[in-house]
Amino acid sequence: MSQELGQPMVVENKGGAGGAIGAAEAARADKDGYTLSIATVSTMAVNPACRPNDLPYDPIKDFQAVTNFANTANVVAVNPKFPAKDFKGFVEELKKNPGKYSYGSSGTCGVLHLMGESFKMATGTDIVHVPYKGSGPAVADAVGGQIEILFDNLPSSMPQIQAGKLRAMAIAWPEDIAALKGVPNFKEAGFPVLNQPVWYGLLAPKGTPMEVVNKLRDAAVVALKDPKVIKALDDQGSAPSGNTPEEFAKEIKEQFDWAQDVVKKQNIKPVSYTHLTLPTTPYV
């Protein structure tokens, strides 16, 4: 994008609070296109649903969508000793044994926790959530058999799946993945509501002129066609998008509504950032 725009783009990492600190600062930046931020499912959907009392920005009202940079697949996988060998048998086994099996995710009220709860809602099954501090420990325990089921981003689980230490049941991805022959996506398996990959994209503060937004989007599209960028994304298990501001705004709103629905219907208790200093007014 720097080459296409003819000026450098400086990355300033503002970590903490699941991305809330950086997002809050970006939302209050000047509306001139010179301060942008990265949108993720966490910052735009999960945080507002899970942390409604102290989130200092509104993901729908405070930002202008520019474009979705890339999508990454999610996966539900099992320990190889799990009695079912395919997705249909997997769901049948869970329905026959409510509460017997446990699933791991990268943490309470994270994207993958909500994916697991959404799975339970869609399939009418009852599995027990075991939260971990990151995907690494969850993957390790799924491989070791401490938990039977894992909801994860595909790139972090793929090495263990390819090694035969985990068995993929289904993926959240628009099409089949060659390296996972015979593994359906959730839409093919009959649950399109679960067929949601994670994404990350570009945002500007709300009120940024559309000619500026479109210029940024055009530069992103050119960058996403660069073979080096495509390879870098592929190496991390992602695929480029580059959709329009309107299309990306629709994706954000759909994911926002999904997270709100899951948290409400599954009675997931809000978590708090009270130990962190967040800028200005809370999200309402």
Locate predicted features.
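Hydrophobic/aromatic residues within well-ordered alpha-helical segments
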Residues: 1, 112-115, 252-255
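N-terminal (or domain-start) structured segment
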Residues: 1-60, 100, 112, 124-153, ...
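Structural signature of the Rossmann-like NAD(P)-dependent dehydrogenase/reductase core
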Residues: 13, 38, 105, 167-172
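Hinge/capping helix and adjacent helix->loop/strand transition within the periplasmic-binding protein
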Residues: 28-34, 41, 49-137, 186, ...
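C-terminal lobe and pocket-closing loops
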Residues: 85, 157-226, 254-257
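Conserved small/polar residues in nucleotide/adenosyl-binding loops
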Residues: 274-280
